[in-house]
Amino acid sequence: MIGSFLTRGLLMVFGYAYPAYECFKTVELNKPEIQQLQFWCQYWIIVAALTIFERIGDALVSWLPMYSEAKLAFFIYLWFPKTKGTTYVYDSFFRPYIAKHENEIDRNLVKVKTRAKDMAMIYLQKAINQGQTKFFEILQYITEQSTPKSKAEEKKETTIPKLDDPILKVKENEVTK
């Protein structure tokens, strides 16, 4: 448990914080080197893909011994200058796969965007309809409260106690005693 907690903390530092800082330094140079920018872009693309697959992978294989440590080592391998892990993983695996499936990915993204837009419009329309309904209910309530009542309506609202009312019987008994 403590090992897993420590490993997650180290992963945050060495997998995200340190690379983000190095990327920041590269971007902020007066004349940033294109190779360095390309390296960090590739790194963050790989990290994004790993983060997506990590949800499934963690559930399936996190029980393996040294899984967290291996994940930490892989992140360090990616950015460590002597290993050039990002370049190797990107050029050997990521780029060929994406290039092969790029058209299919683009088509699916267009479908997802269209569905999301359609769903957003449906929910927006429902919210507008519900808002209108509530607005008119409030308006009706306000107009009912502000219109003066006739004397006949006021008499209807005034309740005349019944003779068999238990409260009246108690009071009647008190008076007769």
From Swiss-Prot:
Origin: domain of life: Eukaryota
Family: Belongs to the DP1 family.
Residue span of region Disordered: 145-165
Record's protein name: Putative HVA22-like protein g
Pfam families on file: TB2_DP1_HVA22
InterPro entries assigned to the protein according to its UniProt record, in alphabetical order: TB2_DP1_HVA22
Disulfide bonds: none
Gene name tied to this protein: HVA22G
Species of provenance: Arabidopsis thaliana (Mouse-ear cress)
Residue ranges, compositional bias (Basic and acidic residues): 150-165
